[in-house]
Amino acid sequence: MALAALIAAYHESGEPGALRATLPLAGRTLVERQARLAASAGANPIVIIVERVPPALGTALERLRRDRLPLVVARTAEEAAEAIDPFDRLLLIADGAVADTDQLRSLASVQGEAVLTVPDSGYGEIYERIDGSTRWAGLATVNGALLRDTAGMLRDWDLQSTLLRRALQTGARHIAAEGPVAILDRQSDLAELERRILAGATPAGAGWAGRVLAPLERATTALTMSSPAGPQLIGLASALLTGLAAAAFLYGWLWTGLFKLLLATPLEGAALRLAKLRMQDDVRHSWWAYLLPLFSGAALVALGYALAATQGWGMILLAFVALAFLIALRVESEGRSIRFSILLAERRGMAWLMLPFGLFGLWHAGLAFLTAYSAGSFFWAQREAHSAPAAAQD
């Protein structure tokens, strides 16, 4: 049984002249967040029901289409019902309602009709009252047939409220919200949610360099989240700077190359954070994400080549050995839990480790250190990865 989503996007907000759907949230609009949450829960299609399409809403819908979300825009309940198979499960998202991904997935997995609830106390009239002790949190699951039946008798009633009432009449389960939920109506409602979204936009698997650069990455993300610049553009800038760094090293411009490398490192992190903020999970498979490791490896080899003129050809060998250990470390660590993995060698961190050696003119010693660091990290990861199974067999 497939999962579809129905998002209401027609109520006026508490802000003059603005729909709830177009309230700005984390650099985009509320309806974009809702649609991406529905997509992350596995919904296809995602039907957005509208009464009018002001420019802000039209722009938001176009951005969603560009990102290839399975979007259907319906202007009437009948159009929405036609877009959804009667045998599909339907995730109903009220106008302005948001929750985290885990709650949506959990609700979508419930068999039969279910509504997400919050306590009556502490929540205002914007949360529809269900009974004497609970209110609707703005999320529910029903079946497509119920939507078709409701569309046929709707007349002038509000679709989301009528669908909720009919689901309750059929005996829908009440499921208490286990995490933060909100129905947003004013600009002032967005501050806390936006803070949580920003705090949660940390890329998974960040090493020690990611922790050190986190404040700079967060600041860059905050500056760019409301701009037209997307993760692809910022990632492209990072890859371009890394490629230019390799070219600078090749010509012997060591400080120029290192400066470009250092500048590229927070941009990469900011691109990943912005992608997570906008729920664009495919950014790690972008072409620039594949170019970055290649350009970084080229920069390391180019540095060895530049140093070979004064330190001998062993510098090039050191660069290739360091690269080999880094690749082996990645293979050895893939899918495994390694103790102290945050301290192991990583591509972005190695650029910053060269900085103190460069300040004292010890570039050759820095390259030797990076090679030793990569080797030590690999052997530690190998020991951790293979000692645990051996201990379990004993």
How should these model regions be labeled?
Residues L213-L291:
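Core alpha-helical transmembrane segments of integral membrane proteins
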Residues L37-A43:
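Short, acidic, metal-binding catalytic loop of nucleotide-sugar glycosyltransferases
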Residues A21-Q34:
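Short catalytic helix/loop segments, enriched in acidic residues and glycine
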Residues L291-D394:
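Generic detector of multi-pass transmembrane helix bundles and their immediately adjacent loops
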Residues M1-A18, W380:
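N-terminal nucleotide-binding beta1-loop-alpha1 segment
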Residues D85-P86, A97-T170, D281-G312, S337-W352:
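Conserved core of the sugar-phosphate nucleotidyltransferase
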Residues R135-T242:
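Conserved alpha/beta core of the MobA/IspD/sugar-nucleotide pyrophosphorylase nucleotidyltransferase superfamily
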Residues R52-L104, T221:
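Short phosphate-binding loop-to-helix
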